[in-house]
């Protein structure tokens, strides 16, 4: 299963380059942490988008929303490094992937 970073879902919703890759992964099933889900909602709303429509579209693919648990939060905290590019949301996405032993799909080029 695929763990979706907020950037991948936002790229899909915005029809950016790589949308076909994200859609294919969505069709195969996947999950998103509730922290990243909040980030997607915030960015859609801040851009003046229709969150209800975006939410319905993403959920129509059967994406699973996974809560952040204490172990995820602590795993993410241990990976914080001053001056490095991974945000809390990024680290919580990686924590979910670590917990579930799944691959992450991101559109964030700073991940390398």
Where are these regions (language model features)?
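Histidine- and aromatic-rich ligand-binding microenvironments
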Residues: 4-5, 32-35, 86-88, 108-109
């Amino acid at each position: 299963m695929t763990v979706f970073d907020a950037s991948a879902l936002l790229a899909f919703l915005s029809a950016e380059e790589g949308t076909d890759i994200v859609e294919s992964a969505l069709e195969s099933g996947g999950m998103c942490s509730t922290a990243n889900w909040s980030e997607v909602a915030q960015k859609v709303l801040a851009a003046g988008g229709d969150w209800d429509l975006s939410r319905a579209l993403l959920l129509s693919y059967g994406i699973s929303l996974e809560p952040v648990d204490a172990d995820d939060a602590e795993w993410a905290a241990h990976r914080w490094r001053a001056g490095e590019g991974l945000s809390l949301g990024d680290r919580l996405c990686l924590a979910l992937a670590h917990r579930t032993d799944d691959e992450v799909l991101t559109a964030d080029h700073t991940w390398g």
